[in-house]
Amino acid sequence: MPTEEEVRKAEAEYGADAIQELKFPENVRERFGMYIGSKDARGLHHLVYEIVDNAVDEALAGFCTHIEVTIHKDGSITVADNGRGIPTGINHQSGKTAVELVFTVLHAGGKFGNGGYKYSGGLHGVGASVVNALSESLDVTIKREGKVFHQTYSRGFATSDLTKTGTCPIEETGTTITFLPDSQIFETTEFNYGTLKTRLRETAFLTKGLKITLTDERTEPETQKVFHAEGGIREFVTYLNRGNEVLYPEVLYCEGEKDGVLVEVALQHNDSYNENCLGFVNNVITPEGGTHIEGFRRAITKIFNQYARDNKILKDNDEALAGEDIREGMTAIISIKVEEPQFEGQTKQKLGNSEARNAVESVVTEKLTYFLEQNPTVAKIICDKSILSQRARAAARKARDLTRRKTALDSTSLPGKLADCTDKDPKNCEIFLVEGDSAGGSAKSARSRATQAILPLRGKILNVEKAREDRIYDNKEIKAMITAFGTGIHDDFDITKLRYDKIIIMTDADVDGAHIDTLMLTFIYRFMPELIKTGHVYLAMPPLYKVEKNKKVWYAYDDEEQQRILNEIGLDNTVKIQRYKGLGEMDPDQLWETTMDPERRILKRVMIDDEDKSEVDLTFSILMGDKVEPRREFIEENAKFVQNLDI
């Protein structure tokens, strides 16, 4: 207990002057998590999205047709648009130019008050000022009313006055912003071309007719990609379905307005068993859904049940189709525009507007009902697939119940092949999923028995991308993983029952090992995605090379490290180099030292950003689906990112 003197001192110190107000830019620089989420690569790229979103607002308002994003060799990035250009006059309320207001005041911009943007993704109006606050340098050039203006900023402050630097044709307008992220703030300041490509492609699909050019000047020759979708979200659905066979050629499309909400929906079924329905509000993805998704699902369930009853596809006594049955294999984009979107939190994860639910349900019900009446063949295909899904779901439920009864998840009913750890606190425990018997044997001998469990996977793992849930219970390896993890799957999933803090996939460093990695990741992503979202899934990184000289041993995890070691020790006839093809080539001591020892090993955590859901779904369907051509294109496009190729 504090003494009376200590209490009096604390009370005296905690006066009005103890309350500190952080002003711009300190409030952003010290509390950046409130504005961009994190200081890692995700937060870094968020800066680009903020500026691009401002340009997209111009496009949504009908004033911008082209956005150019350029990554420069010095690490800076430029976003240029041909919109109206930021106003350059004096704002009478503040006495500052409108440009300086936009870049140095939070919640300033054309999305507030009248005469600005009707629909805007940047709800909070903090984009440009936050980018300024978190940039080592920022330059803005504006073309407006036949004049060219320029101003510079650094870490939130203007470093020059807004100056007229020249003239331009009166019809030539726009804003060009170049900024260099602040290395004092960010863990990395290197922009990822692939990350930006995914986001900008998505933006182009959502903004019909908008052209977006992405250029990377860091490569030789420079890399450039142009995104332009006259078909809008219809083309988006076609793009997302390219890894699967579609069940009918048309992309079903609905468009309308109700209660001030603009609704646009496109959907198409494919031959997979996965639902991929993505929601967007004013071009901002809502990973956790919200009222617009609720309205869509309600409409879809009602429409198809009504159609199936009216056309005797479902008999009077048949069970109604569940929404998940109708959405099996469905790819859908639900894109709405709302004047005042109500998001849950700054990161806009979930929409809360009740009018959005009613608007989407109303528009989809009206338009889709008419389409089905005019296209009975398509309607029958969807209903038939839904009925098959319903039957499979019932079979899966029975198999799941049977599995539960046979293996109540306790220590006495764990898989026989599992070498479990003795510590029962999940926070301390990890499980290695090991390919093959020989490697499994070495791993069991190498492990720390207290905290490391080993599950050898002997048979072939089912490719769940091509199988409904009822079939996975027939696969021994997948059943063993489900039982060992303890969480259950799909609707039964419960993260609190997870038996291990780390699930580590440990396979050979060759093509077969990579294939098994992908099979296991596909299973976890499709049936237990929360394990990935919460950071519990890892890939072990066994060494590729063993380098030996004069009885000293070095391990190299890639070609670059091997070369570095050889440069240090000198390459002569006393050097022995072994290329590991499999985990079984290492004895238990080597396996522990290189791959399993928490003090020395390298693990790669598998993470998925909610904003990348569409691209992740597409990647799994391309890699694990039946269509060869999209897989070939994917490999060709991504081959340059591969560090080690085993042929």
Could you tell me what each predicted segment is?
Residues 1-18, 49, 57-59, 64-76, ...:
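GHKL-family ATPase ATP-binding module
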Residues 24-25:
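Alpha-helix capping/hinge segments and adjacent helical runs
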Residues 29, 86-109:
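Short conserved segment of the HATPase_c
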Residues 30-49:
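Conserved short strand/loop->alpha-helix "switch" segment adjacent to the catalytic nucleotide/phosphoryl-transfer site
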Residues 57-58, 85-86, 511-512:
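Residues immediately C-terminal
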Residues 89-94, 292, 323, 470:
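Conserved, non-catalytic sequence blocks in retroelement Pol enzymes and Pol-derived host proteins
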Residues 391-410, 425-430, 441, 445-447, ...:
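C-terminal interaction appendages of subunits in large macromolecular complexes
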